[in-house]
């Protein structure tokens, strides 16, 4: 195993594919994107395939996930926002599953790749723009004009709102990417301390106790972060969708 804490984020080809000079290779990132989607879909399918009045553990988790996202969407975008439930629920489950899979040794954390998180962010913002203009036409541009702003300040405020809107895919993607990247690097560093000190013999084993405790604590924290980052991504998605549904609501 490499001692480089960033080695775990390297993308490599599994099945090299090149068409017309364009690289379409199937990589470890491709594999774990497919695995994340398959695990999420598989869990929901098996959890709900034998539904009972008194739900089992897996059915309870599936139902809690459904209600959790449904309530989040209603609070963030109103009842009209429920039309976007499939999108928000799919994003939440995909990001959560990808984050959790990345916690296992030798597995690849796809949410530590900025291109992956940026693609998800573009999907969200693209949906906001398409639906906003489809539903409201050019009235969607009211999202850049907050109510109650004095006319003399309007040009400045509109400019700030436009810049803020354009920065959304960047902030949405970087937040998820940076948190997963930093957390996994920290885990790798402390785990490296444990291995290095343990290799020194009896004296080293004694010194490895503290890094080992820190590694265990950080691992627990990273599982929490895996959920929180999926939650934050879903919450922000609901907030952005609210702008598409109610462009003059702020």
Curated annotation (Swiss-Prot):
GO terms for cellular component: plasma membrane; proton-transporting ATP synthase complex. The chain crosses the membrane at residues 29-49, 84-104, 114-134, 143-163, 193-213, 216-236. It is found in: Cell inner membrane. Keywords: ATP synthesis, Cell inner membrane, Cell membrane, CF(0), Hydrogen ion transport, Ion transport, Membrane, Transmembrane, Transmembrane helix, Transport. It comes from the Bacteria. It is a multi-pass membrane protein. One of its GO terms (molecular function) is proton-transporting ATP synthase activity, rotational mechanism. Pfam families: ATP-synt_A. Belongs to the ATPase A chain family. F-type ATPases have 2 components, CF(1) - the catalytic core - and CF(0) - the membrane proton channel. CF(1) has five subunits: alpha(3), beta(3), gamma(1), delta(1), epsilon(1). CF(0) has three main subunits: a(1), b(2) and c(9-12). The alpha and beta chains form an alternating ring which encloses part of the gamma chain. CF(1) is attached to CF(0) by a central stalk formed by the gamma and epsilon chains, while a peripheral stalk is formed by the delta and b chains. Key component of the proton channel; it plays a direct role in the translocation of protons across the membrane. This is ATP synthase subunit a. It comes from Rhizobium leguminosarum bv. trifolii (strain WSM2304).
């Amino acid at each position: 195993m490499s001692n480089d804490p960033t080695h775990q984020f390297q993308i490599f080809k599994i099945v090299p594919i090149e068409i017309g000079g364009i690289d379409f290779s199937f990589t470890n990132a491709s594999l774990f994107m497919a695995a994340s989607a398959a695990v999420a879909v598989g869990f929901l399918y098996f959890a709900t395939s034998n539904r009972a009045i008194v739900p089992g553990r897996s059915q309870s988790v599936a139902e809690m996930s459904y209600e959790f996202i449904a309530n989040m969407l209603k609070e963030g975008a109103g009842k009209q926002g429920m039309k976007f439930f499939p999108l928000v629920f799919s994003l939440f489950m995909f990001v959560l599953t990808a984050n959790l899979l990345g916690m296992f040794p030798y597995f690849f954390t796809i949410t530590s790749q900025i291109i992956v998180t940026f693609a998800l962010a573009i999907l969200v913002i693209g949906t906001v723009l398409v639906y906003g203009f489809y539903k409201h036409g050019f009235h969607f541009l009211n999202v850049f004009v907050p109510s109650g702003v004095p006319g003399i300040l309007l040009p400045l405020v509109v400019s700030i709102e436009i810049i803020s809107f354009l920065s959304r895919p960047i902030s949405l993607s970087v937040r998820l990417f940076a948190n997963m990247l930093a957390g996994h690097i920290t885990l790798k560093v402390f785990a490296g301390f444990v291995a290095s000190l343990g290799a020194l013999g009896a004296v080293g084993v004694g010194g490895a106790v503290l890094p080992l405790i820190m590694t265990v604590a950080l691992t627990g924290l990273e599982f929490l972060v895996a959920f929180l980052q999926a939650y934050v991504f879903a919450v922000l998605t609901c907030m952005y969708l609210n702008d598409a549904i109610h462009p003059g609501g702020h």
